[in-house]
């Protein structure tokens, strides 16, 4: 490739080769004439490129345009390659946007080369050339309208063929127009000021010099073939014309490829097509004449970089084509005699808006920023200001959380009870308040407490009063949160008041449960003094009362040293458990009494000395037997269960007799000992604990080894054994000594009354 500033022209032939291949691929099922025409055009383009190379070496850069025109004129004078060379120059005029108005004058200039040279020399100055271009356009239009009159006789024979072939040609041209608009437009745009304008001037002068009759004879067939797409394009409408303004170069090149064909269109169709082409040609030509001095550099830069035309140019072309389309719709079917007036009117109408359009790029640049702020304002327009239900501050989109038809900050979406942060999957709401699911279940669903939980009515007046006091003292931050909820749309004032009462009642409920749990140990201490309960309560099998609930820690049986009370306790527990129908009451000894097992096991430690002291004085035999029984039990607790039961029964019978004989003293001593035992085992007050050592102190020197022995062996071992074997031992004892236990319980009642 030679280093010339217009090497880009070779891209035209290359792009046209590509379009020929694409056309052959697209139009496989259609007529092959278009492909043949393209092949001829390719050859002509290659020859033109070779001649351009030769002329480029001979001519200077400023006279390079003349050399190009001479080469083109030679190709036009050639009858074989006239059409191809003409189309080679025509693609260089993309800004003209006209469909067919340029080709007939091309042939006219081919026959009048000297006049064309003179015209080119006259207009070497670009400014003068641009100024005279509209005049040249007007000059080249009048003879064309006359030529159309002359070709009536020639075209009548081939109207039907042209109408048939026009449709196929139009269909064949459509895909290429859509495919190659960008490539051809980019590459061919740079030749607008060079060849296209000169051709227009040559056409203008030659149309003045030549008679319309000779012009008609020479260019009639080609012009009619150019206008072959007669009514099809007009029927497409203004939208297609405006879109095809960009594709004008491609359409012109295709029509020039069809030059060898004969014309077959009717006069009316040809006139309509001709006027449409004239109006379209005048609008881009006049615009290009004023656009060139100011934007030739930008055009060259665009073509060098193969950049598609700028948005302003595109919009200008579209506007020009729209104006021409409106003019075409007005001048669709004129009378042949009115051609000149219609052409002049269309030209003046097309030029008037276009002379105002060179100002439009500036106006457009100013209007684009005006329109863009509106778009940006729409894009960045903040939505309606939203405030958080909890904190009443503005909620921005990134921290917005929509839950329960209310807007929250993500950080403010917390449980109103425990203030833990929640998400959409871990919250539950009631009357506009947000809770975590555990507290929602705990507050509103536990124990079937629906009325209180859901705020329909106060469940218990006691709890409500407690809750009001606690709400003012313990939790002053909750009423503001309850007051914030009215801002949410779905919450009313009455439910909010209910929710306040509800929260108070919930806290009252929780506090009452805690108080009950705290008070239970104290109650058990008081009630264990009255243990065992009366026989009527155990035999009745009624629902266990508070005293019975507290007596459960007595189970499992205490140390084997204290077998005097343990079998009876076990027996009563078992009877009550078996007679009570609820599983909850049966399982309660193993759940509620877990905390009291250790204390109940520790309580027998001082019992053996106290018992020994209480019964050793009146009946030494009883104490000896009891001592032997206890010693054997402690020494061999597991293998001697039968002996234990027999010893217990014997001891209980003797004990009953002893109680009958010496009631006042034995009862007093035993009652005080039992009191001291119970209070020491459960950590009772110190005043009552002092009574027990006073009772115990005389006996301690007699049996020094008993307390330690009971500590080390029996308490620890039996704590495990009683849990495992308690029920079995209870059954055996119950079968042996039911009556004695009833008697003993009655005696305990009398003891308590006496005390």
From Swiss-Prot:
Coiled coil: none
Biased composition, class Low complexity, residue ranges: 599-611
Alphabetical list of CDD domains matching this protein: LIM_Eplin_alpha_beta (cd09485)
Location (main, coarse): cytoplasm
Lineage top rank: taxon: Eukaryota
Segments carrying motif Required for interaction with NPC1L1: 164-166
Tissue: Expressed throughout the kidney, including renal cortex, medulla, and glomeruli. Expressed in glomeruli, tubular epithelial cells, and extraglomerular vascular endothelial cells (at protein level).
SUPFAM superfamilies documented for this protein: Glucocorticoid receptor-like (DNA-binding domain)
Polar residues bias: start-end ranges: 88-97, 342-354, 363-375
The entry's keywords: Acetylation, Actin-binding, Cell junction, Cell membrane, Cell projection, Cholesterol metabolism, Cytoplasm, Cytoskeleton, LIM domain, Lipid metabolism, Membrane, Metal-binding, Phosphoprotein, Steroid metabolism, Sterol metabolism, Ubl conjugation, Zinc
Domain LIM zinc-binding, first and last residues per copy: 386-446
Region spans: Disordered: 43-151, 168-226, 241-379, 468-493, 505-714
Keyword Cytoplasm listed: yes
Biological process according to GO: actin filament bundle assembly; cell migration; cholesterol homeostasis; cholesterol metabolic process; intestinal cholesterol absorption; negative regulation of actin filament depolymerization; negative regulation of cilium assembly; ruffle organization
GO cellular component: actin cytoskeleton; actin filament; brush border; brush border membrane; cleavage furrow; cytoplasm; focal adhesion; plasma membrane
GO molecular function: actin filament binding; actin monomer binding; metal ion binding
Compositional bias annotation for Basic and acidic residues: 43-56, 168-177, 199-208, 249-258, 292-305, 512-526, 555-566, 638-653, 662-673
Pfam families: LIM
Assembly and binders: Interacts with NPC1L1; bridges NPC1L1 with MYO5B. Interacts with MYO5B; bridges MYO5B with NPC1L1. Interacts with PXN; this complex stabilizes actin dynamics. Interacts with F-actin and G-actin. Interacts with LUZP1 (via C-terminus); both proteins restrict ciliation and may work together to regulate this process. Binds RAB40B (GTP-bound); interaction influences LIMA1 subcellular localization in lamellipodia during cell migration.
Protein name: LIM domain and actin-binding protein 1
């Amino acid at each position: 490739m030679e280093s010339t500033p217009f090497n880009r022209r070779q891209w035209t032939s290359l792009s046209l080769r590509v379009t020929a291949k694409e056309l052959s691929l697209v139009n496989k099922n259609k007529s092959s004439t278009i492909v043949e025409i393209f092949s001829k055009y390719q050859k002509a383009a290659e020859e033109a490129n070779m001649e351009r190379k030769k002329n480029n070496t001979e001519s200077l850069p400023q006279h390079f345009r003349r050399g190009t025109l001479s080469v083109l004129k030679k190709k036009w004078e050639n009858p074989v390659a006239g059409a191809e060379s003409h189309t080679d120059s025509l693609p260089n005029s993309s800004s003209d946007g006209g469909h067919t108005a340029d080709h007939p004058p091309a042939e006219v200039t081919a026959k009048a080369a000297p006049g064309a040279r003179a015209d080119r020399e006259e207009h070497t100055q670009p400014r003068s050339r641009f100024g005279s271009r509209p005049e040249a356009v007007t000059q080249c239009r009048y003879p064309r309208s006359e030529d159309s009159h002359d070709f009536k006789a020639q075209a009548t024979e081939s109207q039907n063929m042209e109408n048939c072939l026009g449709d196929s040609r139009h269909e064949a041209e459509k895909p290429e127009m859509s495919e190659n608009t960008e490539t051809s437009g980019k590459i061919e745009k740079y030749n607008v000021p060079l060849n296209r304008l000169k051709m227009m001037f040559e056409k203008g002068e030659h149309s003045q010099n030549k008679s319309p009759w000779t012009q008609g004879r020479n260019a009639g067939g080609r012009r009619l073939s150019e206008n072959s797409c007669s009514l099809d394009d007009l029927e497409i409408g203004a939208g297609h014309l405006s879109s095809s303004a960009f594709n004008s170069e491609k359409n012109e090149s295709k029509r020039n490829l069809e030059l060898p064909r004969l014309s077959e269109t009717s006069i009316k169709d040809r006139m309509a097509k001709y006027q449409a082409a004239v109006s379209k040609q005048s609008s881009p030509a006049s615009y290009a004449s004023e656009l060139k001095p100011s934007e030739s550099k930008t055009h060259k830069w665009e073509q060098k970089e193969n950049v598609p035309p700028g948005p302003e140019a595109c919009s200008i072309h579209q506007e020009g084509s729209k104006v021409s389309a409106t003019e075409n719709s007005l001048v669709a079917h004129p009378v042949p005699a009115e051609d000149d007036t219609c052409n002049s009117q269309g030209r003046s109408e097309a030029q008037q808006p276009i002379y105002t359009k060179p100002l439009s790029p500036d106006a457009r640049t100013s209007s684009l920023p005006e329109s863009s702020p509106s778009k940006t304002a729409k894009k960045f327009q903040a939505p309606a200001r939203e405030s958080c239900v909890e904190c009443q501050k503005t909620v921005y989109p990134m921290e917005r959380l929509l839950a329960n038809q209310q807007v929250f900050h993500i950080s403010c979406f917390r449980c109103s009870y425990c203030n833990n942060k929640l998400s959409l999957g871990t919250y539950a709401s009631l009357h506009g308040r947000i809770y975590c699911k555990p507290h929602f279940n705990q507050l509103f669903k536990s124990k079937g407490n629906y009325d209180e939980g859901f705020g329909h009515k106060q469940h218990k007046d006691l709890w409500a009063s407690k809750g009001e006091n606690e709400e003012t003292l313990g939790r002053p931050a909750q009423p503001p949160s309850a007051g914030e909820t009215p801002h949410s749309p779905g919450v009313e004032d009455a439910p909010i008041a209910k929710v306040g009462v509800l929260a108070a009642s919930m806290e009252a409920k929780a506090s009452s449960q805690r108080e009950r749990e705290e008070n239970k140990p104290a109650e058990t201490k008081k009630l264990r003094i009255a243990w065992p309960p009366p026989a009527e309560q155990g035999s009745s099998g009624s629902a266990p009362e508070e005293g019975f609930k507290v007596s459960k820690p007595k189970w499992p049986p205490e140390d084997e040293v204290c077998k005097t009370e343990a079998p009876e306790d076990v027996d009563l527990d078992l009877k009550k458990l078996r007679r009570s129908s609820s599983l909850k009451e049966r399982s309660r000894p193993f759940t509620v009494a877990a905390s009291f097992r250790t204390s109940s096991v520790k309580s027998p430690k001082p019992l053996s000395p106290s018992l020994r002291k209480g019964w050793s004085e009146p009946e030494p035999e009883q104490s000896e037997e009891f001592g032997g029984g206890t010693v054997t039990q402690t020494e061999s607790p597991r293998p001697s269960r039968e002996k234990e039961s027999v010893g217990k029964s014997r001891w209980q019978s003797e004990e009953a007799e002893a109680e009958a004989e010496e009631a006042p003293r034995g009862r007093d001593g035993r009652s005080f000992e039992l009191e001291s035992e119970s209070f020491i085992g459960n950590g009772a007050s110190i005043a009552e604990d002092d009574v027990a050592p006073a009772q115990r102190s005389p006996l301690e020197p007699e049996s020094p080894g008993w307390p330690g022995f009971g500590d080390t062996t029996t308490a620890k071992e039996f704590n495990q054994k009683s849990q495992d074997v308690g029920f079995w031992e209870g059954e055996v004892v119950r079968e042996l000594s039911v009556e004695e236990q009833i008697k003993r319980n009655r005696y305990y009642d009398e003891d308590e009354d006496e005390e």
